[in-house]
Amino acid sequence: MVQTASRSLTEENGADVLQSVQVACTDGVTRTVNVDKSLNFPTGWLVKITVNADGENVETLSGQSVSGTISADGTALGDAVLASDVEILDTTAEGLAGTVSPSRLSGVTLSASDVRYYTVDGNGAIDRLILNDATGDLWTYGVLDDVTNLISTAASSTTNTGSGSSTSNTAGSSASDLVAGAVESVMPSTSTLLYGLVDGSIGSALWESVTSSTASLASYLLKIGANSTTGVVSSVLDYMSSGANYVCYVNGEQTTYKTSVKYPVLAGGISVRKTASGSVGTMAQLLPVTVDQLGAASVRSGSTRYETADDMQVYLWYKGKYYATTLSQINAEDYSLIGWYDAHGSAAGGKIRVLVAVKKD
């Protein structure tokens, strides 16, 4: 799959004739191939690399799909046998790719849309399988730091007058307070959110409906400000259409994602799908569940079982801050546990990616 195509051309005998195309291959190796500059290979396209006497060639591939359930032992996809040395590559439209073991897909049902391409060997067994974000493992997971960072941005954007003053317009300040209050009511602080999930005052159904899309978040925000002035509504729309800095903890380290648009994330667990160059392609909210029971590779919330990701992150929320920790350091009797799982629609997704421990009263 094409990850990048560089127009920094290579000179051959004084003439610019080649461009570099970076391709993620099913064996897990990323290869760079030089091809004619007139050819076009957009990020995410499926290609095949061949080598002959004239050098390397890159050919585009048409989609070829298959569907079925991966057997428990990872040796078959529906009625089709998987070769013992099968190469499986999960991919995203933004150019990310990663190899997948058959055991990772054990028991997973793949639809035709989950499989972008496959090939068979001389025995008719599938020996290469390219997936379409079927695992969810290519996303980056973490927790969003206190959302007041975004609230303060909304407030400051509405206090300025045309001359840039933030103190000379009383109506502007009033509008600022209304917008900040509206944003804060739909985007609660992390503490409000976590304790609200624990005590049930914030329902999962409401949470999911508000964070399903940026439009849903904007709609909810505008309903809150429906009785306010036109200026407030305009300010809310301006707020939703502008970019933001998302301060997060990822694998225990604080990092900031700068985006040109707002995404429907409020607080707690989030997921980021990056481009091949490392910028943000999209961002989504993880969905929360209160954890009643911890298992070796799963958790239970009521009667529902959720598998945990192998690289699940664990955080302690204490006095307004996140602290990276491990399960062995958490005493479940003293802490309420909130699991955050991905709901992107990945066939082998839906795993708990982040676990947050909140001190009980």
What are these regions (language model features)?
Residues 1-361:
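...the same signal can extend to comparable exposed beta-sheet modules
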